[in-house]
Amino acid sequence: MSGIVQWYIDIVGRYPFQAAFVQFAVLGMAGDWIASAVTGKKISYGPFKFLKKMLGWGILGLIIKVGFAGMHGFTLAVYDKLHITSGSDLLFAFLMSTFTNTFFGPQMMLFHRWEDNLLLGTRGYKGMDTAIKTLFWFWIPAHTFTFSLSNHDVQVGLAAAWSLVLGLILGIARRKG
């Protein structure tokens, strides 16, 4: 394993909540910029709004970190209640992804929009139907891969990276639409 990868794994293992905050703050803003570049829509955040937006993304990273831990425990409890004693890691990852994106995902997305509205002084929930649909065609497959990783510490960072990918896909779709 390369030195930088090992350094990353050490940092996210040692400081999981701080790492979740920073990863989402940085990658969330990068996703906003990529989506705006693809759609041709200019982002005009002053420094104060920029910091508020980063704060919002960072808080979302903390919520996702806790949500992933909770959904892992939930999936283990379902296995226990159904007396599933064996099964593939991929099955567990798929079930955890399905539970996460069915029970946790919609509320997290609505919270994220509410938080954006609050921090940026905007209103509205336009486009939430499209966002919710991504849970099934994008996030369940993406998180199945994410949750199949043996190192749970890197899952939040990968989720933040998946957000960049989704932003790019949606930006291209909006541009063509």
Which residue ranges define each predicted feature?
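Juxtamembrane/disordered regions of integral membrane proteins
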Residues: 1-177
